[in-house]
Design a protein with these regions (language model features):
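C-terminal helical subdomain
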Residues: 34, 87-139, 147-154, 158
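Rossmann-fold NAD(P)H-dependent dehydrogenase/reductase core
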Residues: 1-78, 158-169
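Compositionally biased, intrinsically disordered low-complexity regions enriched in proline and serine
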Residues: 58, 66, 123-124, 140
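Alpha-helical membrane-targeting segments
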Residues: 22-29, 65, 71-103, 128, ...
Length: 169
C-alpha cells in the first residue's frame, strides 16, 4: 500500500481535540494536518503489519514541489489583489524550484513498484529541501518527543520501535 504524503506534512500539527477543524478552519492548515496524518497512518500500518505478520507492505512517498493543479487551482478573480499576488508568487516558486508533475510522480512510482523500496519507508526527491531531484529517502517530520503527548491524548502509549501512536483499548 502506498500512501501519498506531502512536504506540507513538515509544518503539519494534529489538533487531536478538533480533528475536523470545526472551531478554526483554514484550508492549508487542514491540508498540512491531513498529510501528516497520512504519513502517521502509513508508518503505523507498517508497524501493525510487522507485529501481526500480515502480508501487507506500507510505504509512503511525496512528490516534492510538483507543478500540478493544486499549486494553481486556487487562482481566482474573486480573490483580493494581495491573495492573488501571493498565489502567483507561489506558482513561480514552484516553476523555478520545483519539478514537473511527471517527475513528482517518480517517488510514488518507486514506492509502489521498486523492489528496493522498503516497508515503512518514506520516499521523495533527494534535492535541496526535497523539492526536486532523483528519488531518495525522505525526512520523516515526526519528532519522538511529540508522541508522548499525542499518545496520552489518544489514550495509549508511544511505541519505542517506530514514531507512531499505539492506542490501547
Amino acid at each position: 500500500m502506498v500512501t501519498v504524503a506531502s512536504l506540507a506534512a513538515l509544518d503539519g500539527h494534529i489538533v487531536f481535540d478538533d480533528l475536523q477543524a470545526r472551531r478554526r478552519y483554514a484550508p492549508f492548515r487542514a491540508y498540512r494536518q491531513s498529510k501528516l496524518a497520512d504519513l502517521i497512518l502509513a508508518l503505523e500500518l507498517d508497524r501493525q503489519a510487522r507485529t501481526h505478520n500480515w502480508n501487507l507492505h506500507s510505504i509512503a512517498a511525496h512528490p516534492g514541489w510538483a507543478m500540478t493543479d493544486i499549486s494553481t487551482s486556487r487562482l481566482s478573480s474573486k480573490q483580493g489583489l494581495q491573495e492573488r499576488l501571493t498565489r502567483l508568487g507561489a506558482v513561480w516558486a514552484f516553476k523555478l524550484m520545483g519539478q514537473s508533475a511527471a517527475h513528482g510522480a517518480l517517488p510514488i512510482e518507486f514506492a509502489a513498484m521498486a523492489p528496493e523500496a522498503r516497508d515503512g519507508g518514506y520516499y521523495g526527491p533527494d534535492g535541496r529541501g526535497e523539492r526536486r531531484g532523483h528519488v531518495g529517502e525522505a525526512f520523516i517530520p515526526l519528532p519522538r518527543a511529540t508522541w508522548g503527548g499525542a499518545a496520552a491524548v489518544a489514550g495509549g502509549r508511544a511505541s519505542d520501535r517506530h514514531v507512531a501512536i499505539v492506542v490501547s483499548r
